[in-house]
Amino acid sequence: MKTFVAKPETVKRDWYVVDATGKTLGRLATELARRLRGKHKAEYTPHVDTGDYIIVINAEKVAVTGKKETDKIYYWHTGYVGGIKDATFKEMIARRPEAVIEIAVKGMLPKGPLGRAMFRKLKVYAGNEHNHAAQQPQVLDI
């Protein structure tokens, strides 16, 4: 019996919608990264993007445990001298709630062109509405 190797043109991708309300950030992000890579499928192939499209709604209602709401700090650099910026989890949720989930998932995906292709299949929205109704996404309970 030969080993099955998925081909990019034969991969079937489904659309799923996930409600992040009350979900723990890290546990949600690991499951999203797993599904974006396609590791939940029998035809998973490491060098082929076999993952599904995932829509995350209510990103502003994601939860963290312990004191991470005030203690977890996100850093970024503007590119200018002395341009290091930071924000706590609470400030990030108020400013850009989508970024919190995106950063968590992006760190769990492979680095390189394949990882970037997987990340493009993640669509995160702060509120309850998304503009992907035409794709008829299935509700995914995580």
From Swiss-Prot:
Signal peptide: none annotated. GO terms for molecular function: mRNA binding; structural constituent of ribosome. One of its GO terms (biological process) is translation. It holds the Pfam family Ribosomal_L13. PROSITE patterns: RIBOSOMAL_L13. The keyword Ribosomal protein applies. Keywords: Ribonucleoprotein, Ribosomal protein. CDD domains: Ribosomal_L13 (cd00392). GO terms for cellular component: cytosolic large ribosomal subunit. This protein is one of the early assembly proteins of the 50S ribosomal subunit, although it is not seen to bind rRNA by itself. It is important during the early stages of 50S assembly. PANTHER family: LARGE RIBOSOMAL SUBUNIT PROTEIN UL13M, RIBOSOMAL PROTEIN L13. Part of the 50S ribosomal subunit. HAMAP family: Ribosomal_uL13. This is Large ribosomal subunit protein uL13. It comes from Glaesserella parasuis serovar 5 (strain SH0165). The gene is rplM.
